[in-house]
């Protein structure tokens, strides 16, 4: 529901509140016969600011300087210190980490085959820089969901937006899945799960197999969302091996890294190409010998040799794929882009691949539909751009409230809604209850 201006609760200690939020909290305390704790002393307050904002304690010199400023004007000293800490690079590192937890940031794929993501760091740095640049939250969301589809003014903008979509490329993956269709559906499911929990505070993925048991999210809505992500190609960059069948390429980024260690001379390129050709020839001969041995009923002793040669071939190919035709190191990253033609999704009964039901159009969650929600998505693109615009619309209050609640949790140890990624019926109601319809849980300009 859209927040609305509500009348503030009456309180007895009218001089204590400094904001609307204080009025709600004080009213709840007074209802229980309690009074607020006294204000913190200068040293305690300074330590809280440092730990909360940059994750480091103040030095003795900083304690002393703050004490001098505090004695002159406590309010001015406090506000100046907040501004100073927000401007430090450690602020982005501290608070970017909180978002990275929500975005399930890790540098490997997890699950049965734990392959590394050597380029995940670009997304990590993007998040840190976004916090340090005080990027508006709606822009932050749009870039991560559909950065590759946003308008740009420079190659640098294009690169940043591509890296932002690493939000969708990270996460656990069943890289040993034999069925490519099943892998695509599982990948889309994981992307739906992280997007809806991180941004909307809703658990949508259980609607893959049945209508949501607690929230008004039918299976048709789940597959409408799934179609958007099935129409999206994900680049996460793991290699293909015998135990990892679903590796992909990485995105070629427009701004080259100035890293001489990643470049190759023409002589080195020729050497690697020659070694690659030799390894591919040996691998082909070994595989042919293994097939002939099996056909003749003999023992096949070549499996370990074949695996070693495959790893060698993969390594040489990766080395060549990391440079352009001139040997200059490419700038690579994780992220997503649209497939040429979108997928029109089909509902799968109980989520089972061999039990297709009706086709549904790509779309959004109807329970959150608002004025301006698109009736039909474009036939020539995935619909992620429209999804990003829908998520960040001024008519959609949920993303801002979810983010405000996450900030509250990190500052006070517990969110106003304690189930920070579940604002649904199975989550916890806001406390105090008056916050449910209040506009106090919004992000200001």
PLM features: residue spans?
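Amphipathic alpha-helix face/heptad-repeat signature
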Residues: 191, 195-198, 275, 309-312
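Short, structured secondary-structure elements
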Residues: 1-252, 337-357, 361-366, 399-437
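Long amphipathic alpha-helical scaffold segments
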Residues: 301-344
């Amino acid at each position: 529901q859209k927040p609305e201006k509500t009348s503030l609760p009456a309180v007895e200690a009218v001089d204590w509140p400094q904001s609307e939020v204080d009025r709600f909290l004080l009213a709840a305390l007074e209802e229980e016969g309690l009074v607020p704790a006294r204000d913190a002393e200068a040293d305690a307050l300074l330590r809280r600011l440092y730990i909360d904002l940059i994750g480091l304690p103040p030095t003795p010199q900083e304690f002393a300087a703050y004490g001098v400023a505090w004695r002159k004007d406590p309010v001015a000293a406090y506000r100046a210190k907040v501004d100073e800490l927000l401007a430090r690079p450690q602020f982005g590192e501290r608070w970017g980490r909180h978002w990275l937890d929500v975005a399930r940031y890790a540098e490997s794929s997890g699950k049965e085959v734990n392959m590394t993501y050597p380029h995940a760091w670009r997304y990590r740095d993007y998040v840190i820089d976004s916090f340090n640049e005080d990027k508006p939250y709606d822009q932050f969301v749009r870039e991560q969901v559909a950065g590759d589809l946003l308008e740009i003014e420079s190659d640098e903008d294009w690169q940043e937006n591509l890296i932002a979509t690493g939000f969708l490329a990270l996460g656990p993956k069943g890289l040993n899945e034999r069925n490519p269709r099943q892998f695509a559906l599982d990948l889309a499911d994981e992307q739906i799960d992280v997007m809806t929990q991180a941004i909307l505070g809703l658990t949508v993925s259980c609607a893959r197999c049945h209508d949501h048991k607690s929230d008004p999210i039918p299976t048709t809505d789940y597959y409408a969302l799934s179609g958007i992500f099935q129409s999206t190609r994900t680049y996460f960059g793991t290699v293909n091996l015998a135990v990892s069948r679903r590796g992909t390429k990485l995105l070629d980024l427009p701004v080259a890294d100035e890293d001489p260690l990643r470049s190759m001379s023409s002589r080195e390129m020729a050497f690697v190409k020659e070694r690659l050709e030799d390894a591919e020839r040996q691998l082909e001969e070994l595989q042919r010998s293994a097939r002939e041995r099996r056909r003749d009923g003999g023992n096949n002793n070549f499996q370990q040799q074949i695996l070693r040669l495959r790893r060698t071939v993969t390594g040489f190919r990766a080395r060549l794929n990391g440079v352009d035709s001139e040997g200059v190191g490419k700038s690579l990253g994780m992220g997503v882009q649209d497939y040429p033609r979108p997928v029109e999704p089909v509902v799968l009964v109980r989520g089972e691949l061999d039990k297709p039901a009706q086709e549904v159009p790509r779309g959004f969650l109807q329970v959150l539909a608002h004025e301006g929600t698109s009736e039909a998505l474009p036939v020539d693109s995935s619909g992620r751009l429209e999804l990003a615009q829908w998520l960040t619309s001024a008519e959609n209050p949920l993303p801002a409230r979810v983010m405000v609640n996450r900030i509250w949790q990190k500052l006070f140890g517990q969110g106003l809604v304690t189930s920070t990624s579940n604002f649904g019926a199975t989550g916890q109601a806001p406390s105090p209850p008056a916050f449910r319809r209040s506009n106090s849980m919004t992000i200001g300009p």
